[in-house]
């Protein structure tokens, strides 16, 4: 009987670990919704920028992402043994927050540069955060395919409240980098426990 209790307790603790690991999905999904929906809508209405330059800036950020993901992935895999995962996670969220702040507080007369820098910061932040975060997911699953499925399921399931949060931020508030930073810190904290 005691063996069954221990197994159940261990199983429940693993589920709690998977849930805590997945909490950053909420602010990340919120940020992605904000960037992909609000930024094009806002910048396309600025006379100097327009829809064409807005699309070009976002496409440029995706091309940069396509190039940097494998390079940073290889680099981070080599550096994780020396520095650990948390360092790279700590770089990622501030980059995302700085990028969002730049996007929603463009400098007068420098809207195009603000747009380009903002989407590049956000994209690099997602790369610096996502690659190590996914690596942590593999590590906590202990290479068990059933646990890996649970980790990914929790992580992706928590993107749903993140999408809803992002939509609320767009609809009900004046979005700024400070709001996202506060939300990020709140949901990022379980990773550092």
Regions found by a protein language model. Name each.
Residues 2-193:
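Membrane-embedded alpha-helical bundles of multi-pass transporters/translocases
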